[in-house]
Amino acid sequence: MLFTFFDPIEYAAKTVNKNAPTIPMTDIFRNYKDYFKRALAGYRLRTYYIKGSPRPEELANAIYGNPQLYWVLLMCNDNYDPYYGWITSQEAAYQASIQKYKNVGGDQIVYHVNENGEKFYNLISYDDNPYVWYDKGDKARKYPQYEGALAAVDTYEAAVLENEKLRQIKIIAKSDINSFMNDLIRIMEKSYGNDK
């Protein structure tokens, strides 16, 4: 709906072929986020906790009764990557982690955490004093970075933890979606032809 509101633009892929023909293309170069923010100014986003790992289209259908409103969920959360930026199943998170770290080995420590949940990257301790942590590059052990117990977080656990953060999102309330869409269309109609 959003990308079909404006007329297509003429586009020639000159970087691929300097003699490329001009073809009509969806106008993806507009600042749709600006229209969205202007329409959103009159609404309060709600916090929503995703159960399971539905795709944006499935969740839009569950919340609004319309899978085509998936882009509302993405834009409310400044998410422009519905594959890596959206919650996945735990298995998919593992597989993405394997792919991400395939060139460095899958069983790597990504970071350590203390009892307060603070993250510490690139640290190592030694057997003679396991509660003193140094940067991996500090081979002479001159500059301790942390003293105390730290728990290692490997690539798989880090992937699951990052994935779980995506469970909490912002949404426009179901009761507001129709008036929001009307406001958004009105804003786009006013700017039609004025912001090219």
From Swiss-Prot:
This is Baseplate wedge protein gp53. The gene is 53. Baseplate protein that is located next to the tail tube (inner baseplate). Involved in the tail assembly. Involved in the tail assembly. Induction: Expressed in the late phase of the viral replicative cycle. GO terms for cellular component: virus tail, baseplate. Keywords: Late protein, Viral baseplate protein, Viral release from host cell, Viral tail assembly, Viral tail protein, Virion. It is found in: Virion. Its main location: virion. Part of the baseplate macromolecular complex which consists of gp5, gp5.4, gp27 (central spike complex); gp6, gp25, gp53 (inner baseplate); gp7, gp8 (intermediate baseplate); gp9, gp10, gp11, gp12 (peripheral); gp48 and gp54 (proximal region of the tail tube). Interacts with gp25 and with the (gp6)2-gp7 heterotrimeric molecule. Transmembrane segments: none annotated. One of its GO terms (biological process) is viral tail assembly. It holds the Pfam family Phage_gp53.
